[in-house]
C-alpha cells in the first residue's frame, strides 16, 4: 500500500517557507474560526475544530491566537468574519488539473485574485465540474516516521477504515474516506503514535507526469495562487517523480 504520493506534490520544499509563516498562520486561524462557527466551540465535541487546533499548535501558532479564533467562531468574542468557502477549477501548464479552495469574506476579490494568478502564470480557469470530477474528497493524516515502519502504521489504522498508507520519505500519510478521518486519527493516538495533521482534502484519480520544466511551471502557478490571502488550499493532479524533485531541490 505504498507508492509515490500524489498528495504532497503541491508542498514542494522551498527556501521561502519562513516568509510564508504569516500567511500560513492566517490560514490556520481561519480554519479554527470556521470550524468553531459550524460545529460549536468545544473541541471535545467538534472533531473538525479539534484537528484544526492541533494543526495550528503543531505549526507553532501562539495559543492566544488559537483561543481568540475559537472564541470568535463560537460567538464568545466579537470580530468574527463571515467566511465563505468557494471552489475554483482550472488548468496549469501541461494540462495539469487544479482545484482551488478559497475561504473569503469577499467573493469578488477572491475570484479576481485567482483569475489573475492563473492567467499570469500560464494557467486557465475552467467551468465548474470540468476538473473536479478528477478528484475525490479524502481524509488525510500525516505523521513523521520517528522510527516507525509502514507496517507499524498499517497495523494501527487498518481496522479504523484506512485505505492507503503512503511513504513520503520523512513521513507517512494515511488516506481514508472523510467520514473515517476521526477514527483513523484516534486509532493512531490509541497506539501511541503522534501525528502532524488530520484534515479532509482532495486526491486525484488520474495524474499527469511532468519533467523538470513542467514541474517548475506548476509550482510557480501554485505559489502565485497561495500568495492570495483568500486562497486556503490548492490541489493538483501533477505527478512529480523523485528524480525531478531531486533536480528541483538542487536549484
From Swiss-Prot:
Primary localization: cytoplasm
UniProt keyword Transcription, yes or no: yes
Record keywords: Cytoplasm, DNA-binding, Transcription, Transcription regulation
SUPFAM superfamilies for the chain: YebC-like
Domain of life of the organism encoding this protein: Bacteria
InterPro entries recorded: Integrase-like_N, TACO1_YebC-like_2nd/3rd_dom, TACO1_YebC_N, Transcrip_reg_TACO1-like, Transcrip_reg_TACO1-like_dom3, YebC-like
Name of the protein this chain belongs to: Probable transcriptional regulatory protein MMAR_2098
Amino acid at each position: 500500500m505504498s507508492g509515490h504520493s500524489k498528495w504532497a506534490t503541491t508542498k514542494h520544499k522551498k527556501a521561502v517557507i519562513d516568509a510564508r509563516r504569516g500567511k500560513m498562520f492566517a490560514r490556520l486561524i481561519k480554519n479554527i474560526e470556521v470550524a468553531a462557527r459550524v460545529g460549536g466551540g468545544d473541541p471535545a465535541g467538534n472533531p473538525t475544530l479539534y484537528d484544526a487546533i492541533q494543526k495550528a499548535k503543531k505549526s507553532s501558532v501562539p495559543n492566544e491566537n488559537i483561543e481568540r479564533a475559537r472564541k470568535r467562531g463560537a460567538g464568545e468574542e466579537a470580530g468574527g468574519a463571515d467566511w465563505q468557502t468557494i471552489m475554483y477549477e482550472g488548468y496549469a501548464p501541461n494540462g495539469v488539473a487544479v482545484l482551488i479552495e478559497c475561504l473569503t469574506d469577499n467573493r469578488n476579490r477572491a475570484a479576481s485574485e485567482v483569475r489573475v494568478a492563473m492567467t499570469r502564470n500560464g494557467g486557465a480557469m475552467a467551468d465548474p465540474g470540468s476538473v473536479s470530477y478528477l478528484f475525490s474528497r479524502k481524509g488525510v493524516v500525516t505523521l513523521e516516521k520517528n522510527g516507525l515502519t509502514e507496517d507499524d502504521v498499517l497495523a494501527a489504522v487498518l481496522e479504523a477504515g484506512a485505505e492507503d498508507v503512503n511513504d513520503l520519505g520523512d513521513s507517512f500519510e494515511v488516506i481514508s474516506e472523510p467520514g473515517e478521518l476521526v477514527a483513523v486519527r484516534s486509532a493512531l493516538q490509541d497506539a501511541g503514535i503522534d501525528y502532524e495533521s488530520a484534515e479532509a482534502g482532495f486526491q486525484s484519480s488520474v495524474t499527469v507526469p511532468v519533467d523538470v520544466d513542467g514541474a517548475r511551471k506548476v509550482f510557480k502557478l501554485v505559489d502565485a495562487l497561495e500568495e492570495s490571502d483568500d486562497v486556503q488550499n490548492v490541489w493538483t493532479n501533477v505527478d512529480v517523480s523523485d528524480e525531478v524533485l531531486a533536480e528541483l531541490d538542487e536549484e
